[in-house]
Amino acid sequence: MDLYENQRSTSKIKRDASVNDRIPDGLFLACPYCGTQMYNKQLGDYRVCAKCGYGFRLQARERVALLTDNFEEMDADIEMTTPDFPGYAEKLARAKSQTDLGESVLTGVANIEGEQVALGVMDSYFMMGSLGSMTGEKITRLFEYATAHQLPVVLFTASGGARMQEGINSLMQMAKVSAAVAAHQEAGLLYLVVLTDPTTGGVTASFAMQGDVTLAEPHALVGFAGARVIESTIHEKLPKDFQRVETLLENGFVDKIVPRAELGQIIAKIVKLHHRTEI
């Protein structure tokens, strides 16, 4: 029996201190809609859930790179005086640094599948895409340029609503942009909206719902007040998908839900069709 005694090894595996065994942030993600856990690279270039088709949120420049053949930015350097709200200047500076944008919307002239359009893309990473004075000014100028140059407007909406730090000046942008939209439409020009996740608040209450054609990405959240606010007001539980674009489609507020990878082709087809009706 002595042959089998004290044979257990007492040596220990040494850990290489130079190796970082921590899983990097963002390596695995959960789909905000269906909850599926997936490896980051499974999303692909379009950052879409392989199970349900939900499009993860994109920064404005990412979307422009995926969507357009070429893009020339407008009004990149315009600035407006910001209100003296505590901490606002610091938040603006941080948002500009994180997104490489001057405001929560990127505007310019683009070619999509060979069709020239005036393009606006809101960015939810810039202070939740909130509607500030500069945001409204840039979108207004986009419509004015499009009207003067007889171009269709394609606007991707993504917003948490009015920017509270700017008070009434933020709310005024709803009417300001709406007036520019009306002038563009009176000129017989096409305004195409693409609703993305999330589109809420004052943006939903104004120019997001004024398009001649309204497209949407799958499972995007679109509404005015948040679900919890509504439930606390009416004291009822809201139905599943109450503020999702699938419900809006069923009730006539959206014309078509389009997978992100197909948006360029669909937008180009609609623009071409509108050109034919003008002849």
UniProtKB/Swiss-Prot annotation:
It catalyses: N(6)-carboxybiotinyl-L-lysyl-[protein] + acetyl-CoA = N(6)-biotinyl-L-lysyl-[protein] + malonyl-CoA. It is an enzyme of class 2 (transferase). GO terms for biological process: fatty acid biosynthetic process; malonyl-CoA biosynthetic process. A zinc finger (C4-type) spans 31-52. Zn(2+) binds at residues 31, 34, 49, 52. Binds 1 zinc ion per subunit. Its EC number is 2.1.3.15. Residues 27-279 form the CoA carboxyltransferase N-terminal domain. Its main location: cytoplasm. Gene3D superfamilies: 2-enoyl-CoA Hydratase, Chain A, domain 1 (3.90.226.10). This is Acetyl-coenzyme A carboxylase carboxyl transferase subunit beta. It comes from Leuconostoc citreum (strain KM20). The lineage of its organism: Bacteria, Bacillati, Bacillota, Bacilli, Lactobacillales. The gene is accD.
